[in-house]
Amino acid sequence: MNETTNEQEVLLLRRKLDLLLRTGKLLMESAADTNRIERNMKRVAAYLGIPEEKLHIDIRWTMLMVNVSDEKHSFSKFQKCEKHGINMEAISKISKLSWRAIEQDYSLDKYEEELEKIARQERNYTPYVVAICTGFACGGFCKLFGVTGLLF
């Protein structure tokens, strides 16, 4: 019976780490900054009951890595991030979801369902809008530092 309990605990921890990584992946692929990703992932880990002192998060452009370790065990999971784009609405919704999950004590199924709703939503910005706005941002940056219209 003890072995079965141990296996169930490991499966539950793996599921929690998977949810944590999917949260981070959505943030990364929506162009959230590293501090926001880490802050939100730590908040979600707190909701999931993973102690911060046992949690290790490493954020790279194409990979998220999470490790939970104590004196006896160490569990690591990795998540590849491939579809980078801009989606400020997803970033905002994930942050609000993490707070709601804590305040309303969501079940893992409820959290996963809400996370999937956010993941399925279409992005607000088409590539053309992003390209045009990037051009305006670059132009504004040039104007800020005194570049004249002739040089621009």
Listing of model-derived features with the role each one plays in the protein:
Residues 101-115, 130-139:
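Hydrophobic, membrane-facing alpha-helical anchors
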Residues 1-106:
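Soluble N-terminal domains of membrane-associated systems
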Residues 123-152:
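Core alpha-helical transmembrane segments of integral membrane proteins
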Residues 113-123:
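Cytosolic juxtamembrane amphipathic/interface segments immediately preceding
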